[in-house]
Amino acid sequence: VELGSTAQVGDIKYRDLNGDGVINADDQGMISEYGGNPRIQYGFGLNINYKKFDLGVFFNGSAMRKIMLTGIHPFGESDYNIFKFVAKDYWTEANPNPNAAYPRLGLQKANSDNNVVPSTFWMRNGNFLRFKTLEIGYRFCRYGRIYVTGDNLAVFSPFKEWDPELEWYKYPLQRTFNIGCLLYTSD
């Protein structure tokens, strides 16, 4: 293998795509024609009024989206911390699980570069549906309304490591709740 460093037990295995018996840069190909850009972004909402009550909801999401786990690799000499999801299931000599979720860790860049080559191994499904906003209100008189709102209430996604809408190093979107009262001066 000539993709970064000499392959060792516990490393990611690569395919000889061009069939020449050598795994090198000539065996690399496009793995996602859209990269991290989703092919579909969507949003939908609903507002309902019934007597003195009102309800509003909004959802947004992304489909046909891929996430590359780049920059998270706990390999080499760069003082990287290890993400919990990597630390829970990686290959070691003490636990040589051939089905470990992540390859062996390396302390020296020279002997672990094989595990950081961009490949489908690091690609994840980044589809998500976010329950973005909920607002419930009550008009208690002709000139007044009380309400409660919630933002970023839930995210449904097969990708569980972090918010699929953001990169791993970004501060996550906060879940917020508000209670308010509106007083109108006229119709």
Regions found by a protein language model. Name each.
Residues Y50-K52, G61-R65, T133, G150-S157:
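Transmembrane beta-strands of outer-membrane beta-barrel pores
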Residues P38-Y42, M123, N127-K132, L173-F177:
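Residues that define the transmembrane beta-barrel architecture of outer-membrane proteins
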Residues V1-G36:
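Conserved small-residue
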Residues Y184-D187:
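Conserved small/polar residues in nucleotide/adenosyl-binding loops
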Residues G45-N47, E135-G137, T149, G180-L182:
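Outer-membrane beta-barrel architecture
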Residues F58-N60, Y147-D151, L182:
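Transmembrane beta-strands of outer-membrane beta-barrel proteins
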Residues A7-D11, S62-R145:
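Extracytoplasmic gating/loop element in the C-terminal half of outer-membrane beta-barrel translocons
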Residues K52-G56, R142-I146:
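Repeated loop/turn-to-beta-strand initiation elements of outer-membrane beta-barrel proteins
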